[in-house]
Amino acid sequence: MATYAIVKTGGKQYKVAVGDVVKIEKLDFEPGAKVSLPVTLVVDGATVTTNAKALAKVAVTGKVLEHTKGPKIRIHKFKNKTGYHKRQGHRQQLTVLKVTGIK
């Protein structure tokens, strides 16, 4: 079995392994910068580590590839009988991260 980790960033959790490219919530780093993310769980073959003291020594390192935007989400507010319509769109800002190591 391969080694993987669950990292928490931007209020979400992601399953990552070395070499994975993941889109996460925007981080304030320039493209090419190295990033370290906090780990919630590590699976190394048959052993699963969830102990907080052991996980304090573990970090997932990655490299920021680029900043991009997610798909457009359209919001439409409507109130009956008043003629009130409001259309709005939103694109979430994302960071593309390549995982370089789990240490």
UniProtKB/Swiss-Prot annotation:
GO terms assigned for molecular function: rRNA binding; structural constituent of ribosome
InterPro entries in the record: bL21-like, bL21-like_sf, Ribosomal_bL21, Ribosomal_bL21_CS
Tagged with keyword Coiled coil: no
A matching Pfam family: Ribosomal_L21p
Protein name, per record: Large ribosomal subunit protein bL21
Family: Belongs to the bacterial ribosomal protein bL21 family.
BP-aspect Gene Ontology terms: translation
Biological classification of the source: Bacteria, Bacillati, Actinomycetota, Actinomycetes, Mycobacteriales
GO cellular component, one term: ribonucleoprotein complex
Species name: Mycobacterium leprae (strain TN)
Keywords of this entry: Ribonucleoprotein, Ribosomal protein, RNA-binding, rRNA-binding
Record keyword Endoplasmic reticulum present: no
Name of the gene: rplU
Biological role: This protein binds to 23S rRNA in the presence of protein L20.
Subunit structure: Part of the 50S ribosomal subunit. Contacts protein L20.
